[in-house]
Amino acid sequence: MLLYICLVNLLLPLSVGAASGAALGVIAKVGVDAALQQIDDVWKGKTVRYWKCAVENRSSKTLYALGTTQESGSMTTVFADIPPKSTGVFVWEKSRGAAKGAVGVVHYKYGNKVLNIMASIPYDWNLYKAWANVHLSDHKESFSDLYKGKNGAKYPTRAGNWGEVDGTKFFLTEKSHAEFKVIFSG
């Protein structure tokens, strides 16, 4: 108990960075020893979370790379346009040394619309689940709207299940090194 109180006093002042609320959640859920090991792994940069995504463009138009919305982590590969009848691949990785997952949105321009692709791979699988969503809209969608199913976006699909929305089928595996398959038909 004394160790827990010391950790709380140590971690609470950290408003940004390696620990904060996520570490406290780990302590409460998995116990002090496991929490200390996870915190140590984060500080040493050993914890890896990412999603690699293959976007298959089955439409007759090019998907133009429009940018990303970073929630946690960033794209670690080249973000390129995807011609018709082609597949583009990229990797989104969590930030090193942060107790956060690999979370964000990738945007492609499709004609006068925007294809928004969201994935959320949690840092702590004991507390959170992986989710994915896709939405074709008139503008770039925020992570929050896609994650919460707001402003015209459908509620996200939990990893391990096929989702289908706006002419797009998608599947996200439920693991730390997730694979995300997106099939866009336009």
UniProtKB/Swiss-Prot annotation:
Pfam family, one: Anemone_cytotox
A biological process term (GO) from this entry: cytolysis in another organism
Keyword Transmembrane: yes
Expression across tissues: Expressed female germline during oogenesis.
Localization per Swiss-Prot or TrEMBL: Nematocyst; Secreted; Target cell membrane
Cleaved signal peptide residues: 1-18
Result when mutating residue 131 to A: Important decrease in cytolytic and loss in hemolytic activity. Loss of binding to sulfatide, lysophosphatidic acid and sphingosine-1-phosphate
Single GO MF descriptor: toxin activity
Protein's UniProt keywords contain Transmembrane: yes
Region described as N-terminal region: 29-48
UniProt motif Cell attachment site, crucial for protein stability: location: 158-160
GO cellular component: extracellular region; nematocyst; other organism cell membrane; pore complex
Gene3D superfamilies xrefs: Cytolysin/lectin
Comment text on domains: Composed of a long N-terminal alpha-helix and a core region rich in beta-sheet structures. Before the pore formation, the alpha-helix binds the lipid membrane, partitions into the lipid-water interface and stabilizes the monomeric molecule on the membrane. Finally, it traverses the bilayer, thus forming the transmembrane pore.
Quaternary structure note: Octamer or nonamer in membranes. Monomer in the soluble state. In vitro, interacts with folate receptor alpha (of target organism).
Protein's UniProt name: Hydra actinoporin-like toxin 1
Organism: Hydra vulgaris
